[in-house]
């Protein structure tokens, strides 16, 4: 009879030991894990289990079922000699199925026990935390009461001491005033007398000093004049009267002069026939006095001109850049001469290379020409500088732009302000003709810009026209922060304009202004009551609630900014919008920023110009003049200017036309230059010397969590040399607003699990922006990190590749000292730089002139071989020296 222990039986049937012991106890048998179990006890346990599960049939059902399967197949395998053989393959599979009812019951019971324990522990923790909170609140209240009592007592003591001290000081002051007045009068009289004596003494000393200096100057001038006269006479005596610069011609001239001095003076004879005009042989047959057949020696080798020719010096006008060939043409010399001079000065250039103004100036002055420096925009600067500058700046009205999400009450706010504050008397109400208007309040005037969306605001900022002083952000109290609200915040921060938040619709059910504050705080818009810098005003545009408070907040912010402008003189401003009217031609809305714009003035607007033929205000009325912060509509320009262009009044219409034509010609160059911006591949070229490189990024993702994670990771990549600047971020697809913001900020666009719409793609293509899509955050971080690494300056490192020991020194007639060496480490290469070491001290650094092995020139010699080494421009090589060969390796820098 086979007997098993309880533990062995549990392992055989796949049931935990504790569970099996409980089942045996339920069947009436108390057993431990090491007790024996007989066959009869097994049968008793089986019968009990069947009754417990409702099975009284007595038949044994298996709890485990094992299936075995065999599969045979034939595999053809290549053998040697191009033949193949068949291999029998047998696959055996075995699978066991177990009944899970017992295990599931056990797991269910254990889960219930765990849940009960967790509930008890949670209740206990909650009770402990509540007790701690009650104790902390009680202690805090007691501490606050104690601090309040101490502060009151201290304040009362200080007030009492101050009153006593003030009474004492008043008594002392009354007694000292009389003595102080008499003493002060006496000291003033003494000081006045001393000052008069000191002034007299200084005047006498100054006069004596001037007389002495005049005497010394006269003596010095007399000595200098006598010395200059003496030097002049000596130079005339020793002057060299050669008429040529050639060495041989000078020697011949000196010999002829000596011969003429030795010859006796004779009567001048008739000139020889050879000098007559008809004799072309010029004295070839002229016989000398010495005898027949001898030619007469020439009296001198003097050339046929009396003085040397000099290059004509001229004035050379040089712009900001100039081509080498053009510079040579202006100096009337060959381009090769200019290149030679530049090579002597240490600058290599080609005939078609463009050089800067400073280099061209040095070259021209080196060649003896006078340089006139010119600027390309010299005419433009001269025209804009010819203005009235004597006027004094005065305070001006603020220019306000109202922005916000759609249906948040921006239009209603504007309408209510117009109805309440624009001067009455207009028949049929007020009609807005242009996109800007101004209102008069009790505390001052305010100018509003009605910009459709954020595109116009971004375009004006991209052209550098900061026309807006304050941005009012309208947020609905029931909707909260929306996508266009976030975009408005980003634009205001990028422009550096203060932000005033107008919380609208506070009279509506469900309005929650505190929720708006909490949402805006996530975008660094903090209310003043929370310690921030932004003013929050609760309004209702429909009921007109607190509109006056909004206007007062705007005027208060303008007083803090201290906005000033020149009211008199020639006007300047910015183009808010422009259009082409069918009956009136080009029409431009101009916001005057300084000066006074008059009807008939000549205006220069970007690439357009013209005389102001008519001016209208926002109500459509004709006006004659407009001061600062006043929007007007002008007619008479040559074309339609772009929004954001600067409008300036000039004196001369002809010069205005020239400047406009120059700007039109330069527009193409500017457009081509803009195509190279915001490229990850060209970021290193956009760096300027001595500045920190910035990588501007516009980030869009599918969820807010991804935006925060990616933005935090990108900002952590910033270093001292390269900085990541996130100019815009948000949730959702890439829109046209994002593309316009990237174009204005020179940024790249990164999309994480989002795509750009059709209008955004057109803007990206037209502006030639860099748009990239990602679905894995690590790929995005790695590519940005690689781009930032490419913006880092490279590092160079020296690596020693070989070392040779000098065994002997030989002399060569061509190369000088030749060192017989043996290579002890690495490899000696001919083209690499070397150092000569003596007792491990560097005594020379240069390059190899010769490397030979057995009289053959070689390129390299490896370790253990002998060779002959000739060091260029160095002959002091001694036995025992070491020749170290190294190479300069460029190390690519990374952000790691």
Curated annotation (Swiss-Prot):
Residues 395-564 form the tr-type G domain. Residues 429-433 are annotated as: G2. Residues 57-66 have a biased composition (Polar residues). Residues 450-453 are annotated as: G3. It comes from the Bacteria. GO terms for cellular component: cytosol. Signal peptide: none annotated. GTP binds at residues 404-411, 450-454, 504-507. Residues 504-507 are annotated as: G4. Residues 404-411 are annotated as: G1. Belongs to the TRAFAC class translation factor GTPase superfamily. Classic translation factor GTPase family. IF-2 subfamily. One of the essential components for the initiation of protein synthesis. Protects formylmethionyl-tRNA from spontaneous hydrolysis and promotes its binding to the 30S ribosomal subunits. Also involved in the hydrolysis of GTP during the formation of the 70S ribosomal complex. This is Translation initiation factor IF-2. The gene is infB.
């Amino acid at each position: 009879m086979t007997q098993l222990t309880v533990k062995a039986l549990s392992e055989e049937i796949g049931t935990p030991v504790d569970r099996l012991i409980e089942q045996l106890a339920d069947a009436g048998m108390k057993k431990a894990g090491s007790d024996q179990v007989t066959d009869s006890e097994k049968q008793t346990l089986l019968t009990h289990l069947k009754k417990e599960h409702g099975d009284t049939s007595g038949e044994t059902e298996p709890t485990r079922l094992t299936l075995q399967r065999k599969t045979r197949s034939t595999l053809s395998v290549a053998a040697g000699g191009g033949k193949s053989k068949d291999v029998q393959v047998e696959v055996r599979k075995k699978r066991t199925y177990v009944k899970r009812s017992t295990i599931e019951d056990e797991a269910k019971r254990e889960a219930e026990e765990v849940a009960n324990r967790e509930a008890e522990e949670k209740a206990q923790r909650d009770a402990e935390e509540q007790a701690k909170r009650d104790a902390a609140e009680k202690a805090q209240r007691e501490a606050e009461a104690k601090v309040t009592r101490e502060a009151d007592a201290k304040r009362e003591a200080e007030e009492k001491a101050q009153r006593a001290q003030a009474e004492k000081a008043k008594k002392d002051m009354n007694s000292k005033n009389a003595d102080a007045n008499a003493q002060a009068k006496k000291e003033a009289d003494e000081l006045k007398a001393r000052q008069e004596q000191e002034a007299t003494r200084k005047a006498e000393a100054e006069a004596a000093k001037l007389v002495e200096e005049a005497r010394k100057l006269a003596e010095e001038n007399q000595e200098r004049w006598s010395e200059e006269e003496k030097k002049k006479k000596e130079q005339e005596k020793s002057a060299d009267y050669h008429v040529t610069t050639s060495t041989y011609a000078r020697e011949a001239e000196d010999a002829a002069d000596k011969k003429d001095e030795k010859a006796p003076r004779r009567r001048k004879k008739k000139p020889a026939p050879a000098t007559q005009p008809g004799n072309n042989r010029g004295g070839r047959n002229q016989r000398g006095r010495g005898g027949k057949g001898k030619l007469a020696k020439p009296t001198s080798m003097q050339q046929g001109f009396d003085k040397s020719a000099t290059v004509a010096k001229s004035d050379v006008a040089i712009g900001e850049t100039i081509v080498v060939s053009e510079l040579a043409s202006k100096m009337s010399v060959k381009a090769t001469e200019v290149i030679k001079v530049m090579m002597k000065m240490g600058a290599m250039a080609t005939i078609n290379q463009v050089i800067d103004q400073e280099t061209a100036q040095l070259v021209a002055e080196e060649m003896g020409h006078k340089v006139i420096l010119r600027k390309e925009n010299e005419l433009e600067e001269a025209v804009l500088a010819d203005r009235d500058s004597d006027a004094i700046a005065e305070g001006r009205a603020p220019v306000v732009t109202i922005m916000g999400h759609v249906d948040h009450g921006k239009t209603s706010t504007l309408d209510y302000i117009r109805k309440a504050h624009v001067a009455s008397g207009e028949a049929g109400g007020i009609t807005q003709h242009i996109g800007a208007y101004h209102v008069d309040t009790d505390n001052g005037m305010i100018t509003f810009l009605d910009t459709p969306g954020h595109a116009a605001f971004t375009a004006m900022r991209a052209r550098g026209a900061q026309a807006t002083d304050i941005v009012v952000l309208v947020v609905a109290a029931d909707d909260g922060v929306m996508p266009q609200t976030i975009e408005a915040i980003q634009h205001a921060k990028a422009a550096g304009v203060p932000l005033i938040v107008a919380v609208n619709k506070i009279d509506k059910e469900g309005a929650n202004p505190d929720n708006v504050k909490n949402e805006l705080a996530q975008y660094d818009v903090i209310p003043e009551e929370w310690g921030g810098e932004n003013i929050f005003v609760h309004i209702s545009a429909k009921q007109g609630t607190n509109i006056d408070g909004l206007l007062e907040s705007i005027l208060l912010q303008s007083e803090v900014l201290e906005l000033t402008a020149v009211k008199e003189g020639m006007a300047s401003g910015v183009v808010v919008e422009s259009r082409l009217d069918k009956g009136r031609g080009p029409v431009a809305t101009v916001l005057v920023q300084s000066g006074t714009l008059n009807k008939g003035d000549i205006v220069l607007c970007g690439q357009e110009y013209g005389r102001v033929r008519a001016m209208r205000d926002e109500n459509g009325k004709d006006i004659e003049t407009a001061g600062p912060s006043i929007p007007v509509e002008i007619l008479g320009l040559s074309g339609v200017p772009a929004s954001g262009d600067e409008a300036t009044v000039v004196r001369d219409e002809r010069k205005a036309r020239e400047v406009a034509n120059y700007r039109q010609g330069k527009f193409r160059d500017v457009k081509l230059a803009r195509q190279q911006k915001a490229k990850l591949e060209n970021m290193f070229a956009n760096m300027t010397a001595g500045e920190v490189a910035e990588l501007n990024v516009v980030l869009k993702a599918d969820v807010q969590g991804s935006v925060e994670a990616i933005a935090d990771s990108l900002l952590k990549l910033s270093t001292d040399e390269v900085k990541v600047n996130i100019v815009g971020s948000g949730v959702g697809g890439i829109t046209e607003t994002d593309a316009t913001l990237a174009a204005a900020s020179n940024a790249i666009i990164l999309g994480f699990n989002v795509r750009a719409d059709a209008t955004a793609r057109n803007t990206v293509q037209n502006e030639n922006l860099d748009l990239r899509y990602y679905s894995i955050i690590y790929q995005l971080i790695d590519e940005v990190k690689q781009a930032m690494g490419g913006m880092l300056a490279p590092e160079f490192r020296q690596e020693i590749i070989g070392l040779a020991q000098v065994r002997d020194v030989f002399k060569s007639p061509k190369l000088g000292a030749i060192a017989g060496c043996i290579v002890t480490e690495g490899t000696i290469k001919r083209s690499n730089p070397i150092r000569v070491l003596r007792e491990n001290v560097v005594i020379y650094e240069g390059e190899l002139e010769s490397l030979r092995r057995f009289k053959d020139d070689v390129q390299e010699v490896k370790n253990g071989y002998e060779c002959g080494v000739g060091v260029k421009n160095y002959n002091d090589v001694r036995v025992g020296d070491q020749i170290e060969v190294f190479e300069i390796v460029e190390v690519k820098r990374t952000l790691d």
